[in-house]
């Protein structure tokens, strides 16, 4: 899909070439529109962004959904975390759940992606199934957690958040 002027201005957050440091300019690229360009390297510089995973963690025995509270905030959200350089997103799902909750994922299902502009991050949402919560032990990133039946999870997740949109889309597809 071609870039529009507004999108180019957003992409021009990256003002300098990541290889040589030269100031980027806007340049037309056939089939793409206006794209950031390094005149020294003579290369187009497509936008760089973070990649993260967000998980709807489901207990296979009870059907409950795990929601967490983090960083002193008062609302429940989904377990999430950044994908490491060179890491597959599917691996990041299991790693983040293991790091934050101690639980081992038995299987995952990809749901959808959404770009989260405030942190310049492509969020990849998955459903992650755990056999039970006997391994559950949170790390320092999690203040508290709670298992919810699906409808209760929907009522308790942070309103107007990307986590809520992911959970609602998952729940709506389950109907």
What is each of the regions a protein language model found here?
Residues 83-107, 112-169, 174:
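Unchanged
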Residues 22, 33-35, 39-65, 82:
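Conserved N-terminal beta-strand and adjoining loop/helix that marks the start
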Residues 14-16, 35:
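Residues immediately within or flanking Cys/His clusters that coordinate Zn2+
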Residues 1-8, 17-29:
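Short, intrinsically disordered, charge-biased short linear motifs at domain edges
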Residues 47, 75, 117-120:
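Short glycine/serine/proline-enriched coil/turn segments at secondary-structure junctions
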Residues 6-7, 56-99:
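Conserved Nudix-box catalytic region and its N-terminal flanking loop in Nudix hydrolases
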Residues 1-14, 166-174:
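A broadly conserved sequence feature marking short terminus-proximal activation segments
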Residues 16, 56, 67, 125-127, ...:
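Conserved hydrophobic/aromatic beta-strand scaffold that supports enzyme active sites
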